[in-house]
Amino acid sequence: MSAKSRRPGTGSSQTPNECVQVVVRCRPMSNRERSERSPEVVNVYPNRGVVELQNVVDGNKEQRKVFTYDAAYDASATQTTLYHEVVFPLVSSVLEGFNGCIFAYGQTGTGKTFTMEGVRGNDELMGIIPRTFEQIWLHINRTENFQFLVDVSYLEIYMEELRDLLKPNSKHLEVRERGSGVYVPNLHAINCKSVEDMIKVMQVGNKNRTVGFTNMNEHSSRSHAIFMIKIEMCDTETNTIKVGKLNLIDLAGSERQSKTGASAERLKEASKINLALSSLGNVISALAESSPHVPYRDSKLTRLLQDSLGGNSKTIMIANIGPSNYNYNETLTTLRYASRAKSIQNQPIKNEDPQDAKLKEYQEEIERLKRLIGPQQQQRSEKQVTAKKQRVKKPKKETVTKEMSDSLQVSTIEQPVEDDSDPEGAESESDKENEAEVAKSNEELERERVENSKLAAKLAELEGQLVRGGKNLLDTYSERQIELEKKLVEIAERKKREIEIQQQLELQEETTLEIRERNVSLEQEVELKKRKLSKCYAKYLALQQELNDCKSDHNQDLRELEMAQNELVKELKRQLLIIDNFVPIEVKQRLYTQAKYDEEQEEWKFSSMSLPTPPGGDGKFSSKRPVSHPQRRRPTSEYALQEAKSNSPSSLRFKSENIVNYELEMPCRTTQEYRTPKVSASLQAVLAQAMQTGGDDIDIVDSHTNSLRSRLENIINANANGGAGPGAGVAVGSSIPNVRNIKSSRGLPSAASNLDSNRRPPTGRLPAKKPASAYPKARGLVNK
């Protein structure tokens, strides 16, 4: 057997820096898109590795966007073609000792899970992951003089938390970093010995994976799944160890809430998915622009992909897109990120003689067990031989003792007994000692046999985990199949070189045409300049459209980030509301002061060692639930107290007891409030005018005095004309000057009082006469 046939894989030991290989795959039109008659906007040219995207709304052929990749596959491409042309060389490099990574990227519902896993029970539709299993074990079975150790793990990133899909009830995992790269401690790994074992592990993990329904996909993946394969290989001749690691990643698709119709829990999942994918896009952009800072720590996904993007790994990015105009914006975004990822350079290094190789530990443990078992088996055989000898000697002693006893009996008959010692008792004691030694040796042998059986079982278990190559070659695959695989690899390499050459020719086409063309006349030169001008103008329009698209995408990203920020703010307010209403103030202050942010795990933690001692004196915090009021049995918020006071049906759940509270019913009122009488507007105006102060008051008094004088004179004249005799007339006449004198001396008030005294009351009755002593008699009148 040649050296080449004994080596695992066919790749070279030293490789220069290489870029991430980007492949685009377009799915066929779905039944829903056909029923809605949505036009196709994607044209794929597999021979050139070109994807052309056209906006149907614009309709201008010059506005078509063209993207070039390492390979492009349309809807007619099969799973077998994709695997043999793209994935097969990468898996061969992993079997050589390199790190490899394959991840599917794109919008939800574009066929990422179909590309990675395929359809169960259908060999033609089998995805990349199960085909990888077959290639690995085919290589192990036909490689001689090598020992292999294959371990697999399966995890998912759900809501920015790492979960072990092989142990669904385990605690959340953490991401750590060391000199060799990023790893996940406490991740459960299963040792596999065949293709069937690896398929069973994948099926168990898929059952535990989170899947949901959306308007875009009935079986939408709600988490990022990572299937890890670690292959350790040891050359039995040179005793060199190589380790190859392969990460197969099925990313969740980016979503827009308006299209997926996500709500409640699905909306939270979509926000976390979009956040992780946007972080991945930022990492790709930073690596493409050779930025000094790459934001790997923005999400758990980018941290796990740190070695695959810009690290020690060979990486393939499969961008899945949809052909419909309905997904134009998402398709354009995916193609742009994929185009940027082409310029990312990795530094793959072969992992030779690693310090953490389990294969080396297993070999050392096997040698130690063999050294323990070897001497014990030799001692066991020696003890068995001695035990057999003792069993053989025992009957001889019995015959000898019988002969001796016979001779002693004869001697006792012939001679008197001189000694009282009994030889038979001494022989029986020696026999008992021999039997005890034999029983003891048998117990030791049985105990050593049990220990040897345990060591042998452990040795068989360790040797069973190590798979030796070069067996069952004729039973699994024939020589023709091996040659066919080699030819397929050569064809894939040749096709890849043809695509690269075709792309280089297209880039140099413009320069070669300018060199070859010779201007014969001015008209041809003008025509040539016009064509150049039209091309430059088309490039200008394309760049301008690209700039506008970038602005719109940036605005869309800002709006999505604002929505995510609003959701986070609402969640924060809800948490703060709970803390303010249900957590005691001293506990809240203590938690705020002791909270620290762990950048490694990206979460807040509390230092239990630095927490203050509680006032109880026993050094322990009370486990009793805090109360908001001493008279209440449980913490109650202000809103619950207000609702408990009302008797509405919705407030029954806030009541601690099944008692309806009613208010006191008061009797009806028998009195009314006093209301002031209404005053007419005209009277109100007169009163307001009368209440005014100023020079008008004097005029009013003068006019009133004049009116009283005129009325008084009329009354006096009437009384004078209606007199009954001379006495009366004289009396009346004599009273006139008296009245005038009174008027002149006492003024208007006295005259008014006399006038009022002569008036009749409103009832028509005369007023009662006053007694004479009421007023003093006049002492005479004085003429003017």
Swiss-Prot record:
Say yes or no: keyword Nucleotide-binding present.
yes
Q: Which Gene3D superfamilies match?
A: Kinesin motor domain
* Domain Kinesin motor positions: 19-344
Task: Please give an example of a GO cellular component term from this record.
Answer: microtubule
Tissues/organs with expression: Expressed primarily in the central nervous system and in a subset of the peripheral nervous system during embryogenesis.
Binding site residues for ATP:
106-113
Compositionally biased tracts (Acidic residues) = 416-428
Keywords annotated in UniProt: ATP-binding, Coiled coil, Cytoplasm, Cytoskeleton, Microtubule, Motor protein, Nucleotide-binding
Tell me the superkingdom of the source.
Eukaryota
Q: Where in the cell is it found?
A: Cytoplasm, Cytoskeleton
- Bias category Basic and acidic residues: which stretches? 429-449
**One GO BP:** sensory perception of smell
Name listed for the protein in its UniProt record: Kinesin-like protein Klp68D
Species assigned in the record: Drosophila melanogaster
Task: Output the lineage of the source organism.
Answer: Eukaryota, Metazoa, Ecdysozoa, Arthropoda, Hexapoda
What gene name is listed for this protein? Answer: Klp68D
